[in-house]
């Protein structure tokens, strides 16, 4: 089955002028990043259909000849870049006509609604107006309102391509107990600066290493009973992060099983991991200091054990060295560097002969 992306024209593929009519070549300007985004979606198997309202097209105020030239040039430019459209559907009515073929109406969609080869679950609609979102709702497909000065909106083309083509592995976990409130958000397919606040600055710094060196977007916000002890905050953060990893990975298709050895001055840390679904943690290392910064060193292996329990991760972690700060940081970095290739998707096969992980 084939997914289709239905796309508005003015304000979505090409920028909309102040008079809302692209009736001259000099008015033709492409929306930023639209071509790379459509190429990515094309490579993901999408076909494209333009669905546009052109108020009074063919009337004296908007002659067809004024529309056709810029429109044909637009299509030729897209085609020169490898982008073709399965169809261009145009409604020429006025808003006051209330024509069923005018968006958000779906009168132009009859043939598509009867086409059983379309993957409607993956299909979507992109436009710059609320009527485009209503059109998507009427088709029961996902709608994206492109961000514009005229009509607002939340999306840009790279974000839309990521959302549709990458099937992004995103998770949001809220863990509330009597002792803590932990919120973890992550996107395994998007790199970004980690946003961490647990009330423990050194622990924050260690968690930042997981996002930065793991190559994924990570946001952790934690409130805990730090006036009593650090234990609950560190443990519950590990559990919430582990749960988020498990949820974002889904059925684990295409992922790998990896290890990484990381030196940090006199310290050497090694992490070997497997998202086997059977949590197990082995730690080899010793700390001389009771705490590093505001983090008790006895809770370092406890954090990793909590992470493994909640994510279904098998982790073997070894560290040796003289400086406890270096050893703790090397543990987090080694885990993150082992996570980076393990989380990367390569194909769609499951890395097991059992049929499930």
From Swiss-Prot:
Q: Where in the cell is it found?
A: Cytoplasm
Q: In which pathway does it act?
A: Amino-acid biosynthesis; L-histidine biosynthesis; L-histidine from 5-phospho-alpha-D-ribose 1-diphosphate: step 6/9; Amino-acid biosynthesis; L-histidine biosynthesis; L-histidine from 5-phospho-alpha-D-ribose 1-diphosphate: step 8/9
The record's region (Histidinol-phosphatase) falls at 1-168
The protein's UniProt keywords, in alphabetical order, are: Amino-acid biosynthesis, Cytoplasm, Histidine biosynthesis, Hydrolase, Lyase, Magnesium, Metal-binding, Multifunctional enzyme
Q: Known EC number(s)?
A: 3.1.3.15, 4.2.1.19
Catalytic residues at 8 (nucleophile), 10 (proton donor)
- The reply on keyword Endoplasmic reticulum is no
Disulphide connectivity of cysteines: none
Q: Which residues form a coiled coil?
A: none
Residues annotated as binding Mg(2+) are 8, 10, 128
Q: Name one GO molecular function term.
A: metal ion binding
Which InterPro entries does the record cross-reference, listed alphabetically?
A: HAD-like_sf (IPR036412), HAD-SF_hydro_IIIA (IPR006549), HAD_sf (IPR023214), His_synth_bifunc_HisB (IPR020566), HisB_N (IPR005954), Histidinol-phos (IPR006543), IGPD_sf (IPR038494), ImidazoleglycerolP_deHydtase (IPR000807)
Q: Which GO terms describe its cellular component?
A: cytoplasm
What would be one Pfam family of this protein?
Answer: PNK3P
Its recorded name reads Histidine biosynthesis bifunctional protein HisB
Ranked from the top, the taxonomy reads: Bacteria, Pseudomonadati, Pseudomonadota, Gammaproteobacteria, Lysobacterales
């Amino acid at each position: 089955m084939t997914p289709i992306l239905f796309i508005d024209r003015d304000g979505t593929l090409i920028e909309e002028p102040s008079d809302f009519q692209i009736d001259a070549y000099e008015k033709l300007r492409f929306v930023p990043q639209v071509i790379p985004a459509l190429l990515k979606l094309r490579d993901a198997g999408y076909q494209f259909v333009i669905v546009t309202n052109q108020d009074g097209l063919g009337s004296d105020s908007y002659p067809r000849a004024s529309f056709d030239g810029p429109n044909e040039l637009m299509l030729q430019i897209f085609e020169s870049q490898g982008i073709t459209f399965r169809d261009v559907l145009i409604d020429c009515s006025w808003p006051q006509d209330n024509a069923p073929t005018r968006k958000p109406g779906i009168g132009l969609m009859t043939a598509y609604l009867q086409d059983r080869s379309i993957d409607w679950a993956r299909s979507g609609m992109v436009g710059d107006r609320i009527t485009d979102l209503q059109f998507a709702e009427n088709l029961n497909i996902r709608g994206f309102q492109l961000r514009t000065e005229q009509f607002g909106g939340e999306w840009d083309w790279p974000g839309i391509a990521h959302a549709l083509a990458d099937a992004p592995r995103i998770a949001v976990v809220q863990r509330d107990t009597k002792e803590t409130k932990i919120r973890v958000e992550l996107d395994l397919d998007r790199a970004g600066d980690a946003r961490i606040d647990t009330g423990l600055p050194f622990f924050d710094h260690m968690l930042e290493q997981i996002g930065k060196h793991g190559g994924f977007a990570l946001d952790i916000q934690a409130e805990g009973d730090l006036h009593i002890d650090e234990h609950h905050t560190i443990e519950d953060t590990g559990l919430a992060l582990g749960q988020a990893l498990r949820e974002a990975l889904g059925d684990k298709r295409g992922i790998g099983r990896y290890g990484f050895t990381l030196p940090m001055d006199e310290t050497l840390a090694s992490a070997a991991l497997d998202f086997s679904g059977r949590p197990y943690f082995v730690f080899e290392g010793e700390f001389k200091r009771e705490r590093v910064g505001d983090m008790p060193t006895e809770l370092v292996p406890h954090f990793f054990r909590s992470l493994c329990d909640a994510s279904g991760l098998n982790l073997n972690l070894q560290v040796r060295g003289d400086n406890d700060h270096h050893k703790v940081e090397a543990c987090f970095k080694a885990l993150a560097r082992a996570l980076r290739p393990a989380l990367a998707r390569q194909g769609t096969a499951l890395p097991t002969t059992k049929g499930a992980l």
